[in-house]
Amino acid sequence: MEHIRTTKVEQVKLLDRFSTSNKSLTGTLYLTATHLLFIDSHQKETWILHHHIASVEKLALTTSGCPLVIQCKNFRTVHFIVPRERDCHDIYNSLLQLSKQAKYEDLYAFSYNPKQNDSERLQGWQLIDLAEEYKRMGVPNSHWQLSDANRDYKICETYPRELYVPRIASKPIIVGSSKFRSKGRFPVLSYYHQDKEAAICRCSQPLSGFSARCLEDEHLLQAISKANPVNRYMYVMDTRPKLNAMANRAAGKGYENEDNYSNIRFQFVGIENIHVMRSSLQKLLEVNGTKGLSVNDFYSGLESSGWLRHIKAVMDAAIFLAKAITVENASVLVHCSDGWDRTSQVCSLGSLLLDSYYRTIKGFMVLIEKDWISFGHKFSERCGQLDGDPKEVSPVFTQFLECVWHLTEQFPQAFEFSEAFLLQIHEHIHSCQFGNFLGNCQKEREELKLKEKTYSLWPFLLEDQKKYLNPLYSSESHRFTVLEPNTVSFNFKFWRNMYHQFDRTLHPRQSVFNIIMNMNEQNKQLEKDIKDLESKIKQRKNKQTDGILTKELLHSVHPESPNLKTSLCFKEQTLLPVNDALRTIEGSSPADNRYSEYAEEFSKSEPAVVSLEYGVARMTC
C-alpha cells in the first residue's frame, strides 16, 4: 500500500471510446492493493487488475479534467477524466508502480487466498501428471525411455527434470548434443503417435555456424530416426524464415547441414520472430482502437498489420507436421532459435491436430503443461510479469490460443470447450493470480516454491467447467481423430471476442452460441417438466376418467416457467453464467462480464464482404 497516495476519487468520468458523441459515465474511482475499481452512478462496477495493465498515459489537462488512458494486456482500454490534476497524477504514479513489480514475491499469486488448506492446494497442483500423460501416449517402450540425465538441471536449466529420449541414446551422446545446441536444449520427445510409431521431438538451433559439426548430435538425430521402425528418414522443421536462419550462421548458430546428418529432410516454414509479432499486434490494436473507421479502412488496416498472415503461418506449420506423421509415418524434429517460442506453438498445435484428447478440457490443460510450461516457454518475459526488458514481451501464447480458436470455428463439434475457456486462460497468463504461468522455466518455479506458496489455475477451471462446455461438442469425437483444417486466406477471421471483448457498445449482436446454450437449458427444463407431469399423471390416474390432463393439473406441475414464457429470440443472452465465482477468478465484476453478447457463430458461412456489425473481418492476400 506504500505506492497508493489517493485511494478514492469522486466525480470521475469513464468515456466510451467508440462513441462519436463522447458518451460517459460518472462515478467513483477506487485504488486498492490489487485492483483499480470504478463504480458508476448505477452501481455498475468495473474492475481492473493491476497486473493486467500494460501502459498508463496521463494526457494534457482539459477544461473537463485530466485524462487518464489505461491499456491492458487483455485488450481492455479505459479512458478516465479525473476532475483534479493532482488526483490524476497520484493515480497515475501509483498505477505505474503497482503494474510493474520488481520481484515475483510481490505478484498477486503470493497474496491470493481462496481459503483452501495446504492439502487442497497440493491436490490442485497434482491434478496434471505429465508422467501419466506420457504413459497414455505409450512411452516408455522398446524405442523410447525416460532419462534422468537432467534430473538436477545440470544439462539444461530450461528443460524439465524428466525427459524422454531414444532408448539407444547414451548419456554421453545426450551431453555432447546439448553442448552443440543453443541454451543446451538438445532433441527430446514431445509427443509419440502410437499408431504410426512416429514422434514429434523438439530442440533449439545447432551451434553449427558455417561448418561446425558435432558427432554426438548427429548420433542423437540418427537414434530418433531409428526409433521409428516404419520410416527411417525424419523431417527437421526449422520454424524460422530461411533468411533469418542463415543470418544466425554468422553468429555461430544456424541450422543443420544435411550433408552431416543421414536420413533427414529439411523444411523451413517461415514463422517470424517475437519482435515482428509484437509489432504486428500493436498495429492490429491501433486499428481496433481507431474511432469511426469505415469497413474498408478496417479491412485495410487489418491486412496491413499482418496479424492473420502470421496466424496462418503458424497453422500451416502445424498442418505440415501432422501430415508428415499421418501420411508419411515420419518422425519430425522441430526447432526455432532457442526452442521455446515457435517450437512450442508448432509442437502443441500439431499434437492438437493429431490427438482428440487434447481437444477436451482436461487434455488441453495437459497440453499447455507439457509443451509450454514444462518445456520452458518464458511466460514471465513474454507476458511482462515483472519490470523487465519490453523487447522480450511478445504475444506468442496469444497466437497459439487464436490458432486453437480458428480450429474450433472450422470444427465446432470436435472441441469439448468453447471460446470462453480460451479467453479465461488468456486472462490468467497475465493476471498473475495463479502460479502456473509465473516464471520462465520449471527450475525457476521450483526455486520460487510456487506449489507451496501459490495455487494452481486448473482445479478452479475444472470446478466451473460447465461454463466452458461447447454445446456442439460431439461425444463421438473419435470421428475427428485427425483434424485437417483449410488454411485458405478467407478462412481466417478477426477474433472479435478476444480483441473487443470489453467494448460493449460496439455493434451489439445476439449470439447464436448463446441461443444454443439457452436451448439446451430449456430442453433440460422441459425434460424435467415431462417427468413431473408423468409423475402427477401416475398419482392421479385413478381420478382422471377421460385421460385428458386438465389446465389446473398443468399449472400445478410447473406454475411459473420463465423458460416457457420467454421467447428465445428476445431473451437476453450470456456466454458465461454471471456469479461471484467468476468474479473471483477473473478479478472483474459480474456486471462487467465481457463475454456477453459477442460470441461468434460456430459454423455459419459468411459472404466475402461482411459488415463490421457482424464482428467478422476476412483476411485477403
Swiss-Prot record:
Family matches, as CDD domains: PH-GRAM_MTMR6, PTP-MTMR6
Q: Where does a 1,2-diacyl-sn-glycero-3-phospho-(1D-myo-inositol-3,5-bisphosphate) bind?
A: N248, N273, I274, S337, D338, G339, W340, D341, R342, K378, R382
Q: Does the keyword Endoplasmic reticulum apply?
A: yes
GRAM domain span: 1-101
Protein's recorded name: Phosphatidylinositol-3,5-bisphosphate 3-phosphatase MTMR6
Query: Start and end of every Myotubularin phosphatase domain?
Result: 124-499
* First and last residue of the signal peptide: none
Superkingdom, taxonomy of origin: Eukaryota
Q: Where is this region: Interaction with RAB1B?
A: 2-141
Residues annotated as the enzyme's active site: C336
Name of the gene this protein is made from = MTMR6
The record ties this protein, via Gene3D superfamilies, to:
Pleckstrin-homology domain (PH domain)/Phosphotyrosine-binding domain (PTB) (2.30.29.30)
> What is stated about the way this protein's activity is regulated?
Allosterically activated by phosphatidylserine and/or phosphatidylinositol 4-phosphate (PtdIns(4)P), and phosphatidylinositol 5-phosphate (PtdIns(5)P). Interaction with MTMR9 increases catalytic activity towards phosphatidylinositol 3,5-bisphosphate.
Q: In which tissues is it expressed?
A: Expressed in CD4+ T-cells.
**pH dependence of function:** Optimum pH is 7.
One family from Pfam that matches here is PH-GRAM_MTMR6-like
Q: What reaction is this protein's catalytic activity?
A: a 1,2-diacyl-sn-glycero-3-phospho-(1D-myo-inositol-3,5-bisphosphate) + H2O = a 1,2-diacyl-sn-glycero-3-phospho-(1D-myo-inositol-5-phosphate) + phosphate; a 1,2-diacyl-sn-glycero-3-phospho-(1D-myo-inositol-3-phosphate) + H2O = a 1,2-diacyl-sn-glycero-3-phospho-(1D-myo-inositol) + phosphate; 1,2-dioctanoyl-sn-glycero-3-phospho-(1D-myo-inositol-3,5-bisphosphate) + H2O = 1,2-dioctanoyl-sn-glycero-3-phospho-(1D-myo-inositol-5-phosphate) + phosphate; 1,2-dioctanoyl-sn-glycero-3-phospho-(1-D-myo-inositol-3-phosphate) + H2O = 1,2-dioctanoyl-sn-glycero-3-phospho-(1D-myo-inositol) + phosphate
Q: Which residues carry this modification: Phosphotyrosine?
A: Y108
- Protein source organism: Homo sapiens (Human)
Main location class: cytoplasm
Instruction: List GO terms (cellular component aspect).
Output: cytoplasm; cytosol; endoplasmic reticulum; endoplasmic reticulum-Golgi intermediate compartment; nuclear envelope; perinuclear region of cytoplasm; ruffle membrane
What EC number(s) does this enzyme carry? 3.1.3.95
Keywords for this protein: Cell membrane, Cell projection, Cytoplasm, Endocytosis, Endoplasmic reticulum, Hydrolase, Lipid metabolism, Membrane, Phosphoprotein
Which biological process annotations from GO are given for this protein? endocytosis; phosphatidylinositol biosynthetic process; phosphatidylinositol dephosphorylation; protein dephosphorylation
Where's it found, cell-wise?
Cytoplasm; Endoplasmic reticulum-Golgi intermediate compartment; Endoplasmic reticulum; Cell projection, Ruffle membrane
Q: Which family does it belong to?
A: Belongs to the protein-tyrosine phosphatase family. Non-receptor class myotubularin subfamily.
